[in-house]
Regions:
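Boundary regions of SH3-family modules and the immediately adjacent low-complexity/disordered segments
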Residues: 1-3, 19, 23-26, 30-79, ...
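Basic/aromatic DNA-contact patch characteristic of tyrosine site-specific recombinases
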Residues: 16
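Active-site nucleophilic cysteine motif
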Residues: 138, 150-164
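Helix-biased detector of long, well-ordered alpha-helical tracts
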Residues: 145-149
Length: 164
């Protein structure tokens, strides 16, 4: 079995033990790579590649084949069902800052990164893009609440802030 896997959800909580009742130690963002260390019922014990966190996730929302080309550069990027900036095509789903995606198709000001999932081009940049002004990045998170183990617009902690 191949041991490099990638998150296919906006983000997944990484639990200390194989239970939703246990403490969240970190989060895995869309496109983030991890290794499976152990399978336990409906849970995987994993180690994240970026920051080496170890914990448990449910056995869903992952893929083996993924080669990211771009990343999210805004606090959150709205996912559209179709490449049109109309209310009826907007979903209530977002990708958080630093998520990694693969651009599959471009249409006007939109890119497709998964089947029937589109992002506005203003929300992405090439995978190797480095923002030089860290203060601007930190200001993106200024009104985000504190969440232990968080790395997203829904809540962030001190280590999550340093990792972005």
């Amino acid at each position: 079995m191949k041991n490099n896997f990638f998150c296919k959800s906006s983000y997944i909580d990484l639990y200390e033990y194989p239970s939703y009742k246990s403490k969240v130690s970190s989060q895995i963002l869309y496109g983030e790579k991890f290794k499976i260390l152990l399978k336990k019922k409906n849970w995987f014990k994993i180690k994240t590649s970026y920051d080496s966190y170890i914990g448990y996730i449910k056995k869903t929302h992952y893929t083996e084949k993924f080669n990211p080309t771009h990343k999210i550069i805004n606090l959150k990027a709205r996912i559209f069902k179709y490449p049109k900036n109309l209310v009826k095509y907007k979903s209530n789903n977002f990708l958080p800052f630093a998520s990694k995606i693969k651009v599959l198709k471009k249409y006007k000001n939109f890119i497709m990164f998964d089947k029937n999932k589109w992002l506005h081009i203003k929300d992405i940049n090439k995978i190797n893009y480095q923002k030089k002004n860290f203060i601007k990045i930190l200001k993106l998170f200024i009104n985000c609440k504190y969440k232990w183990g968080g790395k997203t617009f829904n809540g962030i902690d001190c280590s999550g802030l340093l990792q972005i």
